[in-house]
Amino acid sequence: MRMIKDYRAITNGKYRLVCNVLIPIILGVILVLIDAVVRNCYVTVVMFGFGAAFVTAIEVMGDYWGFGAICVKGCLGMDYLKTSTTGKAMLRNALMADLLVRPVRIAICMALVAVPYGIMVGNPVRPFCLSVLLTANLSVWALNITRYVQSVQVMSVLSMLAYGASGAAVIYITISSGLQKFTWLIMAALAVLLPVGIYVTRRHMYRKVEASYLDMD
């Protein structure tokens, strides 16, 4: 598929390796270590909160190494693409592929939490869907802010804020007696917000790419 080829051509190999391969492995190892220490006590909704927090922080921080502050004028860092007649299309395809990969990558990571939860506690569908949808929304919508940030220190702070917000939200929504009956409604709203976020972010990124080409001219 052309979009995937362009995504691989534009993004750094280390970025793909870390976000698409190493992060799920690291999350799995952490879960195994926690299980070895505290056994059954860890397989609760708290682990979904931890998983969501961990993945959200990596999604936010990892993008800095993948696309950087591409929304800032002069910081695209891919001016070599402007020498090619297909460069603009390649960058657009890569940006779109990145948006589509995020929910899939997040779902795979959260499945590592859902499997032991399902075996030892019960049906993991509700906390799994909530954590995936919430984390994916944060990952996608945050790009409209983080891709303006050039400082790694600021990105680190934003990553930690996202970490806390995601983890706390998943845990609170799931265990709060007042919100439990609205969980499916919340998930439905998040399911609608996700494609909207992908569309809005795609349009935003495309406009910035177009503007960078006009500035070059």
Mark where each language-model region is.
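Short helix-to-coil transition segments within interhelical loops
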Residues: 81-89
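Hydrophobic alpha-helical transmembrane segments of membrane proteins
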Residues: 1-76, 92-217
